[in-house]
Amino acid sequence: DGLKLNYLRISEAKLTGIPKDLPETLNELHLDHNKIQAIELEDLLRYSKLYRLGLGHNQIRMIENGSLSFLPTLRELHLDNNKLSRVPAGLPDLKLLQVVYLHSNNITKVGVNDFCPVGFGVKRAYYNGISLFNN
């Protein structure tokens, strides 16, 4: 089958968006310390095998609704040190998500349904860590 890339980190490269042409075999993608301002719907489409996504230290203000739904196996999401004003939509639907870094953003309000699914009997993994300090 040849080689397949599992881990990729592109840091301090002045990226303004998530590259759409990286290998879809990636399990870990770290794009920290760039200039990414938004996550749009199709940005994560090909990265369905990711279990760790690092987007800390960017300028992300907006995460389009539904864009995280392409990451069904995601366990860790690093969105610290950005410019988010609210918790991204769709976190409760990521059933394996355990760690969410949202510290050092501009989040002023956290809703009761921002992290947990609505309704009884909906199964998901327990969170090991959610960071919201310095908002």
Swiss-Prot record:
Protein name per its UniProtKB record: Biglycan
InterPro entries referenced in this protein's UniProt entry, alphabetically: Leu-rich_rpt, Leu-rich_rpt_typical-subtyp, LRR_dom_sf, SLRP
Native source species: Oryctolagus cuniculus
Main location: secreted
Organs and tissues of expression: Found in several connective tissues, especially in articular cartilages.
Glycosylation sites: N65, N106
One Pfam family recorded for the sequence: LRR_8
Gene (UniProt): BGN
Record key words, sorted: Extracellular matrix, Glycoprotein, Leucine-rich repeat, Proteoglycan, Repeat, Secreted
